[in-house]
Amino acid sequence: MHFKSYFIYTTIFNMAWGAPIPFPDTHSWMRNREREPSEIVKVPCSARAPPCKLTYELNGYFIENGLICYNRASVNYFETCYTGNYDYKLPLHPSFSKFGGHVYLSCDDAILQNVSLVGIQQTEYTSSPLLITNSNSEKISYSNLKTGFLGIVYAVETRACIQPDQAKKPEEIINHGVAIKPSCTDGVLYYINSACEVNVSDQTFSIPSCESVKLPTYDDTIEVCDKGGCQNVTCHPGEICDKYERMDMIMRIKNYQCSHIYRYSLYSIILFFVIVIVFTLITIMNILFFLKPAFWLLKKVLYSMVGLCHRRPVVDEVSVDMSTVRVVDEAEEGLLVVEDSIAPNTNVSDKVKRKGRKVENGLIFIPYVLMILLLVCSAESCQDLVSSISNIERCTNNSCDFISKMKLTLLNTPQDFCFKTSTDVYKIRFNSVRVMCLSVPLYYTNSFKRVISREEWKCFEGEGCRTDGTHSIWGESTSLSFDYCVTDFHIFSYCPAYHYNWKRIEYEPTSSRACTIMKCMDTKFEIVGYIQKNGHVLKELGGITSKYDSPLVSISLSNYNSARMPREYAECDGKAYLRTANDLGSFDKELLGNIQCPTKEDAVVLSSKCKTKILSNEDLPVIRYIERDGVDMLEHVKSEPLKDVLVSSSGISLSTLDLFPVELNLQFKEAITSIITSKISLNGTSCKITGIERKFKKTTVSIESSNKVYLSDILACEGLAVCPMILNNIKKGTCITTTYYSVTVGSMIKCKFIYSGDTLMCKYDVSPLEITVISPSLDVSSFEAVKTSTTNWMELLAGIVKDNPKLSLVASIIPIGLILKTIRSFLDDIRQVD
């Protein structure tokens, strides 16, 4: 909700409750990000933050649960950055009850904005708004604060108190609550008046109020922690009839005992389908009856339109014998004739006369009318991709013309960009975009292990006991090695007091395939598509290049999402990896560095031509061994290869959705008069969302239009991740996405196309993620039943003790009881035999 609508809401409330909340001018430091950005201040940023636990539509830095995190998404405005340490204990505004996922006050509040761009500056004791301006963005980029905080970041779920005077801190309510043991049913945690942390496997969720909260994800056992400690809680499945309202039709039929009105519901469904069939038949009959009159009316309208274009010939102005006239030119005024023709021209005057074109009727204009209609229809696939446009006057030798410069932003492909000049209609088709980073090798490296190959004791120092590798008592080695000396003092040594221990450390390769550290030197791109003029292909687009040139336009790459395309990377075995400060490992926990070899052959064997490079605060050129046994062995860095990145001999390239948004610079050689965009009618379009919530890529959004359409857009729905929706002259389309939080099943939620801005209501039929806990059935009535049981008794007893330590004594008695019962059964069998 925007601030203006919120102020109307609060004004109505305050007629009975009090004065409105005194907010400062929020447009300058707090902007809603659920609407189209009216103004963007781009912030160059090199900050680092852990990834966010939830996923949002925008790419950038977020305040989530009171902490700064980084969210990676396809929509990137490059407008967030921060420096310093954010302190969530300093509230940004005294009336905020919740900000950035952290609860400050407990009061009767209202939502201000779900996601907002906020400028914040903090000192050691206070927090205040920061104006979102270019100067402040530069200040954030170049500052390095040790204390305090500066930032322009996204904040989630901002709420404010309607009556700030009645607000209480959450601790005041929690301290007066009743402490009970937490319980969990169907993923809903109940823990009255208690702030807690919930651990589910390796995930941790901080929840301000655990009174009744649906967990983002859960397991059969979760851990709930508060001020009093942590305790394990079992998430029990609810009764089957409790889920009756969330069941689909088939499940309700199977569980008919849960509903007393099932029979009436079934009759209602049958009646509904009968009504639908009857109305469908009536609609079909109406179409059949009105189809022939509709065509007749269309014919009359076309004849009426072309009849207005009919022009009768003006033959009475001049009488010309065409056999005696030589035509020089046919201009707008008519036929030009001259006196000095080959013919005598005795019947023509000196001045130019007009001859009307004879047209029998207006039917000749019907093809032109149909062509105009086709042009309008073809524009339905066009989108407004323009970020900026300007017309520039260019003059040469006193003659001037205009050229148009334009910047386009692509969020997905395929896309069509259509425009008009003074004479023609053009369309540029973008089927796909690929960016390639042309790279050169910086050096070659390999993973290694340390081996002490030589060791010798000396009683005299000789030329000196060095630890920096500048002197050695041995000759040079053919492999990469390091010689150093350690001085030690022992009273009972064979040397007088001091002795000197010389060691040679050799670095042996642990891989037969060396890696190459590459650096991107130039960026080129490829567009697969074409340029069309008046329905005819003017130029095909394709091939890696730095610029596309055509008789109409030149296209170059301006910007792209480089998160998956690093400037420097490690190429190992045909795959690309992020380059870290230590490449393939570290020398010890505080000393980072790498081995650099001039050729790949040297890196395979780690020859003496390789060098060790160290990165530290002192910027030491070589390793200094201070501890007795030298450095620790290499700790390998476990990393995954860059996803969807293709490696070639020229460099790396990327063509997936991770590449977007892509910005292109276009320079036209003709002035553009207008941009043609599509306006797709969504009337009669149905939309349905199905799948399983909180499972990655397990939700499907399906739309069906009443007629065939061209559509390539980004669909954003409430509670769902954005997904690309593409329809190529078809009626139905689907896209796969992820549902992040629950919405009532069967309700209608609002979805929006990012390019066109059109909205669509979709029916939400996503099944909640449920778990079922099945307990084993145990039979201890006889020794035969115990012997044939598939139950692992040791695991069962260990689970009993783990879930409830108080039962450890009882669990230890169970085996003894089974043994006694078995002996008793055996004695009874003997008595029966006797």
Swiss-Prot record:
Changes after translation: Specific enzymatic cleavages in vivo may yield mature proteins including glycoprotein G1 and glycoprotein G2.
Superkingdom of the organism of origin: Viruses
Pfam families listed in its UniProt record: Tenui_PVC2
InterPro entries noted in UniProt: Tenui_PVC2 (IPR009547)
Swiss-Prot/TrEMBL site (Cleavage) positions: 381-382
Note: This putative envelope glycoprotein shares many similarities with bunyavirus glycoproteins. Still tenuivirus virion have never been observed as enveloped.
Protein name: Putative envelope glycoprotein
Record organism: Rice stripe virus (isolate T)
